């Protein structure tokens, strides 16, 4: 981390993502860049050296804690504490971590094959050696030894020898890559064992400080950016349908049901007038005149159903002999649908009483 600006940021992000991926943690590049910019703002002395040790990283943690106390925890990125804890564990396992060296020495199998092809095709030209690591040095040395006597042979033998030499080089490169993969695998196993056997007691910070840092890390943990074990999908059950109690019957059916409950069936029979009376006093049913019905309908629409004139017309209609069916038909013909529903409801309630 001896360079600054965009180059230093790219190196830091690349190295940090590779170290975390080796531990099975995948962090987004945007989160790593945000963490790097946060460290630059919090710690004025970071980064200054090519290597990073545990003491410097603990100092960065103290500065993060002080920054959170001054500006509040909302000003700290969500992934700051988890990344800080993971890198602290890495530095605990190995005292000094040379990040730039680890980045420069990471040679992939594709790079080795490209270097081998370039050496075989340019055997008659000037040879140039890079600083790619020990793997390229071994390949260049073998190519120099074999190229000394290639051109002394006839053309056919030379072509045949070139093919054999190319196969030998490919086998050697594969062996080198295999040795590198084996060493990486052993190193990962060693790091895992060291991680499991790590002593979490620390003398530089008090137990309260470490607890505070770990609580903040758990508080700012985000499953969308730091992918941990997959959660099982919870299947929600459909809510059971509510069963409502059926409403009691209304109207004549309601009256019959109430009479059956109370054991009184007198209202189920028609009313019969008993006694002596003149024929003139016997009520005679006549249909409601159409003129009276129109007058009542006009009064309801123009003045309202509760206007004094409307009530006078209703009293005139009530002076005649009307059956319940006549009243229902009259109300339906003169009132609006809403007023008719209200009238019928009140009529049924009064009938029950």
UniProtKB/Swiss-Prot annotation:
One of its GO terms (cellular component) is viral nucleocapsid. GO terms for biological process: viral budding via host ESCRT complex. p10 is myristoylated. Keywords: Capsid protein, DNA-binding, Host-virus interaction, Lipoprotein, Myristate, Nucleotide-binding, Phosphoprotein, Viral budding, Viral budding via the host ESCRT complexes, Viral matrix protein, Viral nucleoprotein, Viral release from host cell, Virion. SUPFAM superfamilies: Retroviral matrix proteins, Retrovirus capsid protein, N-terminal core domain. GO terms for molecular function: DNA binding; nucleotide binding; structural constituent of virion. The keyword Lipoprotein applies. Nucleocapsid protein p14: Nucleocapsid protein. Binds to single-stranded DNA. This is Gag polyprotein.
């Amino acid at each position: 981390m001896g360079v600054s600006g965009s180059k230093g940021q790219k190196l830091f992000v690349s190295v940090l993502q590779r170290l975390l991926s080796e531990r099975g943690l995948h962090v987004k590049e945007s989160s790593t860049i945000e963490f790097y910019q946060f460290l630059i703002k919090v710690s004025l002395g970071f980064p200054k050296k090519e290597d990073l040790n545990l003491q410097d990283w603990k100092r960065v943690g103290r500065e993060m804690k002080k920054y959170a106390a001054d500006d509040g925890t909302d000003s700290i990125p969500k992934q700051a504490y988890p990344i800080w804890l993971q890198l602290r564990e890495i530095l605990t396992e190995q005292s000094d971590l040379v990040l730039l060296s680890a980045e420069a020495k990471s040679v992939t199998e594709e790079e080795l094959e490209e270097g081998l092809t370039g050496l075989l095709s340019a055997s008659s030209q000037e040879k140039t050696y890079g600083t790619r690591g020990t793997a390229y040095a071994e390949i260049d040395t073998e190519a120099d030894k074999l190229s000394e006597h290639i051109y002394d042979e006839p053309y056919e033998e030379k072509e045949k020898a070139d093919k054999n030499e190319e196969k030998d080089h490919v086998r050697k490169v594969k062996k080198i890559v295999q040795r590198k993969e084996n060493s990486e695998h052993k190193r990962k196993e060693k790091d895992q064992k060291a991680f499991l056997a790590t002593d979490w007691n620390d003398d530089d910070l008090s137990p309260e400080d470490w607890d505070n840092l770990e609580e903040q890390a758990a508080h700012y943990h985000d499953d969308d950016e730091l992918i941990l074990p997959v959660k099982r999908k919870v299947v929600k059950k459909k809510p059971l349908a509510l069963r409502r109690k059926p409403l009691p019957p209304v109207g004549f059916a309601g009256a019959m049901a109430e009479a059956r409950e109370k054991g009184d069936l007198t209202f189920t029979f028609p009313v019969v007038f008993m006694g002596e009376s003149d024929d003139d006093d016997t009520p005679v049913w006549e249909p409601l005149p159409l003129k009276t019905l129109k007058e009542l309908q006009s009064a309801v629409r123009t003045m309202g159903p509760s206007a004094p004139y409307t009530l006078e017309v209703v009293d005139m209609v009530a002076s005649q002999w009307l059956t319940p069916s006549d009243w229902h038909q009259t109300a339906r013909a003169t009132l609006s649908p809403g007023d008719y529903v209200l009238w019928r409801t009140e009529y049924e309630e009064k009938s029950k009483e």
